[in-house]
């Protein structure tokens, strides 16, 4: 499936046109937000309408309202799907959300070309996702440098230890995401975090992604050593996403108050 998505993305890039830059954009640091989270573990809450493996996740989809509810519930950052073909996302969702909340915005897409980085800047992203299994390590590093040169941060995602080690042979990402879902098979296991995390350098922020739907799951990856989690589907399936965040953290820790 990953190969199919990348092939589609390459075709899309051939006809990609850049929009005018969003005006008066204030950049917000994803790494800083995750290093000083509202709770004992950081939360990147995801705005996602659909996925290739699960189909339509949220028919009643109002991205800005969802993002505002996430912010109210104490999320540290917001991830926005912008891939249209497979996730029913849109670049406009990210721009609208950027102008509505005061949190760092992660662009969740399949970034494989420099032009997508410029596009990310223009639509208002604060950070982008770079997928280790989708790119040669050298190419990923070049895109990483390009992003930081343009004022964006990167969440570098891996699923396997081997992918991580290939990247670490070249550089150490500031934020490393461990995807518990295999993007080739879509099989998900939280054990992936436990297997990969011992090989992550101590200075990197560690984000556990996918398969986190209960407070028990949250505690599990926190025990493994994750600094933050990225949660999408389990929140999006709840009518009240604000309440869903409180429920997710119920057994971990209540939100820090005044």
Curated annotation (Swiss-Prot):
Signal peptide: none annotated. Pathway: Amino-acid biosynthesis; L-tryptophan biosynthesis; L-tryptophan from chorismate: step 4/5. It catalyses: 1-(2-carboxyphenylamino)-1-deoxy-D-ribulose 5-phosphate + H(+) = (1S,2R)-1-C-(indol-3-yl)glycerol 3-phosphate + CO2 + H2O. It is an enzyme of class 4 (lyase). Gene3D superfamilies: Aldolase class I (3.20.20.70). PROSITE patterns: IGPS. Its EC number is 4.1.1.48. One of its GO terms (molecular function) is phosphoribosylanthranilate isomerase activity. Keywords: Amino-acid biosynthesis, Aromatic amino acid biosynthesis, Decarboxylase, Lyase, Tryptophan biosynthesis. It holds the Pfam family IGPS. GO terms for biological process: L-tryptophan biosynthetic process. Belongs to the TrpC family. NCBIfam families: PRK00278.2-2, PRK00278.2-4. This is Indole-3-glycerol phosphate synthase. It comes from Geobacillus sp. (strain WCH70). The gene is trpC.
């Amino acid at each position: 499936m990953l190969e199919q998505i990348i092939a589609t993305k390459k075709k899309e890039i051939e006809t990609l046109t850049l929009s005018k830059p969003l005006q008066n954009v204030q950049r917000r640091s994803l790494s800083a937000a995750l290093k000083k989270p509202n709770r004992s573990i950081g939360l990147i809450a995801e705005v996602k309408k659909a996925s290739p493996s699960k189909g339509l996740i949220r028919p009643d989809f109002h991205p800005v309202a969802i993002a505002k509810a996430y912010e109210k519930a104490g999320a540290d950052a917001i991830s926005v799907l912008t891939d249209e073909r497979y996730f029913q996302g849109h670049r406009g969702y990210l721009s609208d959300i950027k102008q509505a909340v005061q949190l760092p915005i992660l662009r969740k897409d399949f970034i494989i070309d420099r032009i997508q980085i410029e596009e990310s800047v223009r639509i208002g992203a604060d950070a982008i996702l770079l997928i280790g299994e989708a790119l040669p390590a050298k190419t990923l590093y070049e895109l990483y440098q390009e992003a930081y040169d343009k004022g964006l941060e990167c969440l570098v995602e891996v699923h396997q230890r081997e992918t991580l080690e290939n990247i670490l042979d070249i550089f150490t990402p500031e934020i490393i995401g461990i995807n518990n879902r295999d993007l080739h098979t879509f099989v998900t296991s939280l054990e992936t975090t436990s297997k990969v995390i011992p090989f992550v350098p101590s200075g990197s922020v560690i984000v556990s992604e996918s398969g986190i739907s209960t407070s028990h799951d949250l505690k599990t990856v926190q025990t493994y050593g994750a600094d933050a989690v990225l949660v999408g589907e389990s929140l999006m399936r709840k009518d009240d996403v604000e309440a869903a965040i409180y429920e997710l953290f119920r057994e971990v820790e209540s939100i820090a108050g005044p």
